[in-house]
Amino acid sequence: LINGYSPFCETFFDNAIAQKEDLVGQINKGWTVGKRLLQHERSGMSSLVGAQSRDPGPSLVDVAIDSIGLGPDDKLAEAETRHSIIVHNMNNTAFALTRRRTVEEIDGGQTPGPATSIFKMYGTELQQEKSTLMCSIRGVQGYGWQDSSNFDADELEWTRAWLGNRAASIYSGTNEIQRNIIAKRVLGLPD
């Protein structure tokens, strides 16, 4: 509810009985099936599938120019904000290229494997960073809530996106869990 909506739910099945023919995988091996489902979900979370179909919204540069303006040298007037945007855009481009390579590997028949944890974790961190920068660049106007007389629809939407993106590091396995998976299954570190 932090952003005004409730996308999460928890369902409990008490005294549930499953028929033998409805069993997925082996008896008492549900976590193995569950991990594979989470892997698939994480690959979707990190935009491995349909990455180009999403509208990314306004660019940080456009919002910064509108909110802060350009200096006499035609550069963004605030050097610190300019640096933050450049670093974010470079990281986002590197992530997009790595994501594209992985999509090509999947198209070639490879299974993404535990690397999806890296995509999920880093993708959500980039998403959170962008929404934080977007609100920060707008100053006070970037943190509107319900007062439509002082905030336009875009400003209210970006505040909700910023708050909603806090959940991105929780769903599909928290980023802390992703770090553990990466340590064990990608880097081969001991328990």
Residue ranges and their predicted role:
Residues 73-79, 108-110, 189:
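Secondary-structure transition/capping motifs at alpha-helix termini
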Residues 93-150:
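C-terminal helix-coil-helix/basic helical segment that borders enzyme active sites and/or dimer interfaces
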Residues 37, 60-67, 101, 105, ...:
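Generic, well-ordered alpha-helical scaffold segments in large soluble proteins
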Residues 28-50, 138-191:
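Glycine-rich phosphate/cofactor-binding loops in nucleotide/flavin-utilizing enzymes
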Residues 1-4, 135, 160:
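A general structural signal for short secondary-structure junctions and capping/turn motifs
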Residues 1-96, 168, 184:
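Glycine-rich beta->alpha junctions and the first turn(s) of the following alpha-helix
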Residues 80-88, 113-122, 159:
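Alpha-helical scaffold segments that form or flank carboxylate-/histidine-based iron centers
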